[in-house]
């Protein structure tokens, strides 16, 4: 499975590492993916990989 949030569909970002001499080398900023379990309206459990930011938003709105 790709490193994507299954709810918000956000993926990794790209940027640069910067050394002390300010040399730039490409790097990837991965999401902080975590596995959560949600209950559907019918009571069925589903497991999703979501970012920590999405998990925090779901918790705020009472879905987790």
Swiss-Prot record:
SUPFAM superfamilies: L28p-like (SSF143800). GO terms for biological process: translation. Residues 1-23 are annotated as: Disordered. Signal peptide: none annotated. GO terms for molecular function: structural constituent of ribosome. InterPro entries: Bacterial_rp_bL28, Ribosomal_bL28, Ribosomal_bL28/bL31-like_sf, Ribosomal_bL28_bact-type, Ribosomal_bL28_sf. GO terms for cellular component: ribonucleoprotein complex; ribosome. Keywords: Ribonucleoprotein, Ribosomal protein. The keyword Protein transport does not apply. Belongs to the bacterial ribosomal protein bL28 family. NCBIfam families: L28. This is Large ribosomal subunit protein bL28.
